[in-house]
Amino acid sequence: MDIMRSVVGMVVLLAIAFLLSVNKKSISLRTVGAALLLQIAIGGIMLYFPPGKWAVEQAALGVHKVMSYSDAGSAFIFGSLVGPKMDVLFDGAGFIFAFRVLPAIIFVTALISLLYYIGVMGLLIRILGSIFQKALNISKIESFVAVTTIFLGQNEIPAIVKPFIDRMNRNELFTAICSGMASIAGSMMIGYAGMGVPIDYLLAASLMAIPGGILFARILSPATEPSQVTFENLSFSETPPKSFIEAAASGAMTGLKIAAGVATVVMAFVAIIALINGIIGGIGGWFGFANASLESIFGYVLAPLAWIMGVDWSDANLAGSLIGQKLAINEFVAYLSFSPYLQTGGTLEVKTIAIISFALCGFANFGSIGVVVGAFSAISPKRAPEIAQLGLRALAAATLSNLMSATIAGFFIGLA
């Protein structure tokens, strides 16, 4: 029954996308079918197929090892505030977001910058981009951007496409925006992992977002024009560093900006949510609903969607609440709310944890529309009106991509 519910959930998400399509007759079954099969195949290999699961587990161990090196840098600055004694002192509640998550973002951003400098990232992106281009029958610029989102966030994507943006057709531009919103950056992945989200789920979700973003981009806005973008030399930075030290330093400074942005937004939004909950609770108290909150409203509204995706009805309220927080605020705040359920152990089923982890894994939220429109408009002012028109539809496509990955994850974990 649960397996069939997951299948129905996939069909429902595809049906929603079809209803939102701007040109239903031009939908390419070749591209859409291949993207869906590839998204399912990646999920099956990484979550169900034993050799694939083993590979993901080893990769997760590697990420944990990388995080331990990040702790060395944090300990040098903050001392015992990042050590195990904090958990003893505070009876298991010694996790401090500012000292554990934010330094990891800085470290990993610097590491990624180094890997770009020595050519590892460029080689990997070229190989994967070529595979996805041929498998999905998409343009080179679309595959290039989609694969790059594994490592870079939506803030960096505009800089990558800057040399080509004036030659990109409307569909390619839409796909680029969708890919950025549907994905997470490598540096942010470490941040989520620092809050207890299983790394193997984050790795799988990151890869599944590549075909997932293209799948829903091509349903909501089918390709109707041939690509005009041709290039030989792919550039990953507008001003590439000239030395190993410069690469590390510039990456660290970029990481600092990201960490500062994350800290500022999370601090502000957590406070705003508390204020909104106080208002809702006060008004609700007049009618006998003193415990009403923004989270409970999201939970009631989105619980049916969470259930059709495969979450048990007993947990659907929680899942719906977290999905709502992610959409209305951002994924970091949603993961922060999810974190206590990951620390307690045994309160949620493995399948539920997986579905929620995948559903929250992406930049798709209303705030991202402003980020994307502002960033893309800055590099191509003449296309600003067109970019603004694509924002809300791109958010819908990216959200559906995240929910599809979550539904597929629930399907395969239900089989295990």
Swiss-Prot record:
Q: How does it sit in the membrane?
A: Multi-pass membrane protein
Which ranges does the record mark as transmembrane? 3-23, 32-52, 105-125, 173-193, 197-217, 269-289, 353-373, 395-415
Q: Which GO terms describe its molecular function?
A: nucleoside transmembrane transporter activity; symporter activity
Which residues are on the Periplasmic side of the membrane? 1-2, 53-104, 194-196, 290-352, 416
Keyword match Membrane: yes
Q: Name one GO cellular component term.
A: plasma membrane
Predominantly, its location class is membrane
Compartments it resides in: Cell inner membrane
Annotated keywords:
Cell inner membrane, Cell membrane, Membrane, Transmembrane, Transmembrane helix, Transport
Q: Kindly indicate whether the keyword Transport belongs to this entry.
A: yes
- State any GO BP term from the record: nucleoside transmembrane transport
- Highest rank taxon of the organism: Bacteria
Give residue ranges on the Cytoplasmic side. Answer: 24-31, 126-172, 218-268, 374-394
Protein family per UniProt: Belongs to the concentrative nucleoside transporter (CNT) (TC 2.A.41) family.
Query: What does it do?
Result: Could be involved in pseudouridine transport.
What name does this protein carry?
Putative pseudouridine transporter
Look up and give the organism this protein is from.
Escherichia coli (strain K12)
